[in-house]
Amino acid sequence: MAELKNDRYLRALLKQPVDATPVWMMRQAGRYLPEYKATRAQAGDFMSLCRNAELACEVTLQPLRRYKLDAAILFSDILTVPDAMGLGLYFEEGEGPRFERPTDTVDAIKKLCIPDPEDELGYVMRAVSTIRRELKGEVPLIGFSGSPWTLATYMVEGGSSKTFEKIKKMAYAEPAALHMLLDKLADSVILYLNAQVANGAQSLMIFDSWGGALSHHAYREFSLRYMQKIVDGLTRFADGRQVPVTLFTKGGGLWLESMAETGCDALGLDWTVDIGDARRRVGDKVALQGNMDPSMLYASPERIHQEVGQILSSYGKGTGHVFNLGHGIHQHVDPEHAGAFINSVHELSPQYHK
């Protein structure tokens, strides 16, 4: 495979010296870009886009043609793993993802099989290897998965939820059943992420989108415990270099110290946390990624520039910061404003690395 020309992102995650703060955006390949909309229309629907390695590669590369980004992230969905377990994933307009066969009983959980990443999830691996080849070493490729807790919320609820009533009922009334499900999911995610590394992913990220819905103790029991299991089982060295791992719990500001103890390399921060405060709390244990409010991209380029400066100043001098949004970019953001954000990071960050 081609030698990596820009390793700023990987170096920052490992707290090695960099010349500037690396930057990428969660959901950088997405609906805010007209070229993405055109490719998605060509594919027919979202999952057809995910399952076509060439088109998934095309949308992964689109934001890199527009912007000076320091990393590419695999174009896929966190729900590929439960879909491969046979739950029948489909998308309803305005409703988001749904499952034909929710996993809301002990019997349903017992019947679940751990998917083979090279078989049922082979389309993801083909996308990873295609993207890695087409990147030609320009920037590193990030592979990812949802966390066991987050995947379980969709599987038990049958889709998106605002209240998480069904899964919380299972957590408190039938905890053994939920632990069985989370254990199977953790084993599945370990295989899935290690297969991504084997096919060319150079960094890994675990998205715990709904960990913040849990109480203090329940988070440790039902979310963090299983992310810890995954971190322990991951391939951490490939292609002659370390494969950094980032954990991101949206709404997880309460648990940064505990997350940093898992052995991961970096923590993603949402916009509710002050990044300077987070740095003081975790010390030298982990790097930090984040954490501008995605809605700030609706502001003027001047205001975006100011906000970038404020976050850089809050983090302070030295490596260990990957600039990102605090969650995914919104679909109605002006692409020019996303460009202003990225350019501001490149312009303002070098002074913090002298």
UniProtKB/Swiss-Prot annotation:
It catalyses: uroporphyrinogen III + 4 H(+) = coproporphyrinogen III + 4 CO2. This is Uroporphyrinogen decarboxylase. Its EC number is 4.1.1.37. Catalyzes the decarboxylation of four acetate groups of uroporphyrinogen-III to yield coproporphyrinogen-III. One of its GO terms (biological process) is protoporphyrinogen IX biosynthetic process from glutamate. The keyword Plastid does not apply. Signal peptide: none annotated. It comes from the Bacteria. Its main location: cytoplasm. NCBIfam families: hemE (TIGR01464). Pfam families: URO-D. Homodimer. InterPro entries: UROD/MetE-like_sf, Uroporphyrinogen_deCO2ase_HemE, Uroporphyrinogen_deCOase. PANTHER family: METHYLTETRAHYDROFOLATE:HOMOCYSTEINE METHYLTRANSFERASE RELATED, UROPORPHYRINOGEN DECARBOXYLASE. Pathway: Porphyrin-containing compound metabolism; protoporphyrin-IX biosynthesis; coproporphyrinogen-III from 5-aminolevulinate: step 4/4. Substrate binds at R27, Q28, A29, G30, R31, D77, Y154, S209, H327. The record marks D77 as: Transition state stabilizer. It is found in: Cytoplasm. GO terms for molecular function: uroporphyrinogen decarboxylase activity. Belongs to the uroporphyrinogen decarboxylase family. PROSITE patterns: UROD_1, UROD_2. Keywords: Cytoplasm, Decarboxylase, Lyase, Porphyrin biosynthesis. GO terms for cellular component: cytosol.
